[in-house]
Amino acid sequence: EIIIVESNSTDGSRAVVQAYADHPRVTLLLQDRPRGKGFAVREGFAQASGEILLIQDADLEYSLDDYERLIRPIAEGQHRFVLGSRHAAGSGFALRQFADQPVHAFVLNCAHWTFATLINVSCGVWLRDPFTMYKVFHRDCIAGLRFESNRFDFDWELLIKLIRRGHRPIEIPVRYRSRSFKEGKKIAVFRDPLTWLWALAKFRFQRL
């Protein structure tokens, strides 16, 4: 099944996804306004019926051709939680390269390693790419969990809660093409890092 949550984007996404509205294996959820990535993913979770859940953004920074290799370890019962890593062994460090905004790219690359170190130290793991969009897991991993984050801090909440439940992810290399802010990247360079720090402090110690 494919569950599409479209938040009334201004980039033409709605017109594209509406073409699949009548497909028998597609569930289309149309929102009246953008409420953030976390809100959209939580809406999708509520509609999902499959045993394996995979999160995919519509901008296609990540290749759809990696689906099989991400799902296979879970489908074969080897692991419960998989991260599609841009920086795992075999893929190198996929530096964000915004030709038109090199300063923004440099800031995001530095921030990635800084925040990755914080989450690794705080949670007792060693992950090269904890903030990857590709998070794939068996639905049992989130059974009984309540999620509340609406923006990109949802990635922190999901990762931290699954690790605290004992589901330590494996990382599998994936292909990645960075999208610049002029191409529609939505991260708020100053606001979002503050929400990430709050999410780390909150969800690392909050009762599950």
Please name every model-derived segment.
Residues 125-126, 147-150, 159-177:
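Catalytic donor-sugar/metal-binding loop of nucleotide-sugar-dependent glycosyltransferases
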Residues 7-8, 21, 35:
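Conserved short acidic donor-positioning loop in nucleotide-sugar-dependent glycosyltransferases
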Residues 6-15, 60:
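A conserved acidic beta->alpha catalytic loop
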Residues 106-118, 189-208:
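Catalytic core of nucleotide-sugar-dependent glycosyltransferases
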Residues 25, 31-47, 52, 64-152, ...:
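Acceptor/aglycone-binding surface of glycosyltransferases and processive sugar-polymer synthases
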Residues 1-9, 29-31:
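Short beta-strand/loop segment that forms part of the nucleotide-sugar
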Residues 44, 59, 118, 138, ...:
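Residue-level signature of catalytic and energy-coupling elements of molecular machines
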